[in-house]
Amino acid sequence: MEIKQIKAREVIDSRGNPTVEADVILNDDTIGSAMVPSGASTGQKEALELRDRDKSRYLGKGVLKAVKFVNTEICDTLIGFDINNLSKIDQTMIDLDGTKTKSRLGANTILSVSLAAAHANANRQHKPLYASLNQGGNYKLPVPMMNIINGGEHANNNIDIQEFMIIPVGAPSFKEALRYGIEVFHHLKSILEIKGMSTTVGDEGGFAPNLASNEDAIKIILEAINNAGYKPGKDIFIGIDAASSEFYDNDNKTYNLISENKSFSSEEFVNYLAKWVENYPIISIEDGMDENDWNGWNLLTKKLGDKVQLVGDDLYVTNSKILKQGIERNIANSILIKVNQIGTLTETFATIKVAMNARYTSIMSHRSGETEDTTIADLAVACTCSQIKTGSLSRSDRLAKYNRLLRIEEELGTQAVYPGLNAFNHLN
């Protein structure tokens, strides 16, 4: 079936900023649509999103240029293409852009069409997206990494560490894992209220209180887990996204925790994180070191690589070439997958394949600026990513993905496998 038309429009994301939505329409009038997300803390090597920079509209964040590229250049090029050949569609857009970082057309522009094409193909096949894209026949529901305390670039508070997550590995199913997380979330809210702390939420739906230290976030989460009737380190583990690049001083080569008035060398910050791992049931650390501090990453991997999932986000930016370099240097043991970091579905799948071949785990992830689009939920299942990050247990832009996963689990029935702790089976 061939592409008949492609069109795009400006829509609004969860931070009140414009983003791109594209429709791919086939000759039989089948339609596939997708909206693209946007990040706040971004890696330096990410593919670049295109913004209008016209200060008279949306403070310069409009995407009319991206919309025009879809409606003209991309549409004119892809009309008549076979929708079943998604990789050819993606490669044609990559070639049309002609830059290493997709800076001419914009990664957001290209991605909107890449994802919409996948949806159109699935709809043509009368299949859900996860089934249309799945090639292995096995279906795993991802373990959710629920960001219940927000800090850093995702909140207006004094916490340096960007995300404190709960990971319900002890649940027997995704549905029950979601229940575990929601119950802990509500107990955490009660604790914060009793302590007279703020229960406002950050970009990703987690609470954003001011705390005496970053470590206090872990302690208060453990209290909530216990109050909910679960066992830390058995039913529920903790994960953190340090987003260290956001507080790394490149000139002085130091990690500066402003809220604690502390400064660390790379080795000292590795030891700081290692102490947390020793004292608390932490199973995953994302971006523990700055994206360019590869020597620091080596130290961190040697120290904790057999004990904790070490996730590269800003480090790898969903780029298979950078990931291969990291694998060769034995840096980290996991990669965060964000489709808009690389800009096409084909390149995303290629990166996941590289990770799988190296026995690195892959974590499908949202961005802090999201929409009601649920594509990443299907992608997590289609690619058998063992985990998913899609925020906390509030804000409809986050819960839309959780609700989609509930429906997928129900559809799959006995075919649905929730891996639980096995999602981390590369650890001792």
Swiss-Prot record:
Looking up InterPro entries in the UniProt record yields:
Enolase (IPR000941), Enolase-like_C_sf (IPR036849), Enolase-like_N (IPR029017), Enolase_C (IPR020810), Enolase_CS (IPR020809), Enolase_N (IPR020811)
Cofactor(s) for this protein?
Mg(2+)
Against Gene3D superfamilies, the record matches this protein to: Enolase-like C-terminal domain, Enolase-like, N-terminal domain
Q: What is its EC number?
A: 4.2.1.11
Q: In which pathway does it act?
A: Carbohydrate degradation; glycolysis; pyruvate from D-glyceraldehyde 3-phosphate: step 4/5
Instruction: Write out the entry's keywords from A to Z.
Output: Cytoplasm, Glycolysis, Lyase, Magnesium, Metal-binding, Secreted
Going by the entry's taxonomy, the superkingdom of the source organism is recorded as: Bacteria
Catalytic residues (UniProt)? 204 (proton donor), 338 (proton acceptor)
Q: List the Pfam families.
A: Enolase_C, Enolase_N
- A GO cellular-component term linked to this record: extracellular region
Predominantly, its location class is cytoplasm
Q: Which GO terms describe its biological process?
A: glycolytic process
Free-text remark on how the cofactor is bound: Binds a second Mg(2+) ion via substrate during catalysis.
Reactions catalysed: (2R)-2-phosphoglycerate = phosphoenolpyruvate + H2O
Key word Signal present: no
Indicate which residues the UniProt annotation says bind (2R)-2-phosphoglycerate. Answer: 162, 338, 367-368, 389
**Where is Mg(2+) bound in this sequence?**
241, 286, 313
Localization in the cell: Cytoplasm; Secreted; Cell surface
HAMAP family under this entry?
Enolase
Q: Which family does it belong to?
A: Belongs to the enolase family.
Provide the assembly information: Component of the RNA degradosome, a multiprotein complex involved in RNA processing and mRNA degradation.
Role summary: Catalyzes the reversible conversion of 2-phosphoglycerate (2-PG) into phosphoenolpyruvate (PEP). It is essential for the degradation of carbohydrates via glycolysis.
Name the UniProt record assigns to this protein: Enolase
Annotated gene: eno
